[in-house]
Amino acid sequence: MNQTPRLSPIRAALLATGVLLSAREVWAQGCVASRCPVNMSPGERLLRSVDGNADHGGEAGIMVTVGYRWLRSDRHFTGTHEEAYRQQEGSEVINNSSYVDVTLAKAITPRFALQLTVPWSEHDRSSVVWDDPDRAKRTRILERFHVQSGGLGDIRLGGTMWVLDPTVHRRGNVLIGLGVDAPTGRKDEKAVHRRLIDNANDIVGDDLRNVDQSIQPGDGGWGIPVDVFAYYSLAKTLSVYASGSYLITPEETNGVITSRSNPFESVMSIADTFAGRVGFDWLVLPKAGLTVSLGMRAEGVPAEDLLGGSDGFRRPGVAVSIEPGISWMKNGWAVQLSVPIAVYRERFKSVADRQWEAASGVPRHGDAAFADYLILGAVTKSF
């Protein structure tokens, strides 16, 4: 008969907190700028792998996690249709983005913990200048230019709580989280862009303006993140997990001017975001604390928010990925790595798209660039 490994109350609260919101980057799928945190790897197996080692760190009730996320987005989609011609003609917009976050968690009781997350991001975005502003008359690309942005993101303070007593219910449990996102990241980062000044003579000049919404460090509004994480042990070395996050943004727009041709996209929208994961994990080497996992992941931006309006410029959409991962935990340390590979991408029609259609009678459905894969990593130390 399989026995559930011992799990101290403090370790349960701490590890669940770190698992649920470790690697709290400003999540993004390229141009679809989702700002939702999702756990890097399933938690029950990590709890088991740590407590399978006698010397797994102190019981001070503190956990520090440093998370990392990298992506390159250059695949353009309108709805579910890929605009393959963009890469063929070399006009694709390319985002190279790196996100680093530091999360400090403190267990208050065996069931409740508080945490503070400070995110940082760095971006490089490149696009092209055509020889004519009229798309129908374009014949060649004059140049490709790059803009950079980065800095402090929107800081989050939140709490998590086990639904069931983790000292009693060790085989399965549900963790819920609630917090607040403060608009500490810059919403109006600017950079020098290149634009066509004289198409008759192919003259290109500089233009200082706000960078694209997808590479702004912050979104300019307050948010209410709601999180849930659940696990259930199917066998001694096999578990199923599920998690979800939704960021509620009551404010509608942030007042930052865009350079969009659609007048209904003249200012940036403050959009809700969502993310979720489900899958299995397998403790392959219990004594070494080594776990492998396989699951599905979805993240994106809805076309309409739960609260408040949804006007302004946003690129709503969703990316669904297969997510293999590996994790190692021992002596109070945890290292996690996963590489989600996209299998489905869709750019939704936005409120601004529909407003354009109603005003002009002309169909409109904007596009968005997505990544083929992501690289996610996190290192955690418990004290």
Q: How would you name each of these model-derived features?
A:
Residues E122-S269:
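Outer-membrane pore/translocation modules
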Residues V64-W70, L116-W120, I176-A182, A242-Y246, ...:
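Transmembrane beta-barrel strands of outer-membrane/channel proteins
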Residues Y68-W70, K106, V118, M161-V163, ...:
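Residue-level signature of outer-membrane beta-barrel architecture
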Residues C36-N39, W70-Y99, S214:
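Surface-exposed strand-loop-strand hairpins of Gram-negative outer-membrane beta-barrel proteins
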Residues Q29-V32, G52-G61, S73-H76, R111, ...:
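Short loop/turn motifs that connect adjacent beta-strands in outer-membrane beta-barrel proteins
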Residues F77-R86, L247-F383:
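Outer membrane beta-barrel transmembrane domains
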Residues A60, N96-V100, I141, S149-I155, ...:
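Residues that define the transmembrane beta-barrel architecture of outer-membrane proteins
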Residues V102, L157-G159, I176, V226-V228, ...:
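Membrane-embedded beta-strands of outer-membrane beta-barrel proteins
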